[in-house]
Swiss-Prot record:
The gene is petE. This is Plastocyanin. Keywords: Copper, Electron transport, Membrane, Metal-binding, Thylakoid, Transport. Residues 1-105 form the Plastocyanin-like domain. The keyword Transport applies. InterPro entries: BlueCu_1, BlueCu_1_BS, Copper_blue_Plastocyanin, Cupredoxin, Plastocyanin, Plastocyanin_cyanobac. Belongs to the plastocyanin family. GO terms for cellular component: plasma membrane-derived thylakoid membrane. It comes from Anabaena variabilis. The keyword Phosphoprotein does not apply.
Length: 105
């Protein structure tokens, strides 16, 4: 299944919309650049069930999306450990642009 997460709210807030999402292993999350770019999506190496820097890196998209309407997607591996994965936008992390994806077991 594919889910969409907007980068920046429709009202221009520095948030992921939705900020929390529950998926299954093998699902895809499309990150759609919406408002107040630039944005990127970085998964926290310490805040994932495997505490794996390699897994976090493989899920992340560090390149900045500059224009509204640009998107990038992440497919969670079929063997992704169940639990909570925290991600953030590097330029706007200090403003609270952080989200969580829960992979159901």
């Amino acid at each position: 299944e594919t889910y969409t997460v907007k980068l920046g709210s429709d009202k221009g807030l520095l948030v992921f919309e939705p900020a929390k999402l529950t998926i299954k292993p093998g699902d895809t999350v499309e990150f759609l650049n919406n408002k107040v770019p630039p944005h990127n999506v970085v998964f926290d190496a310490a805040l994932n069930p495997a505490k794996s820097a390699d897994l976090a890196k493989s899920l992340s998209h560090k390149q900045l999306l500059m224009s509204p309407g640009q998107s990038t997607s992440t497919t969670f591996p079929a063997d992704a450990p169940a639990g909570e994965y925290t991600f953030y936008c590097e330029p706007h992390r200090g403003a609270g642009m952080v989200g969580k994806i829960t992979v159901a077991g």
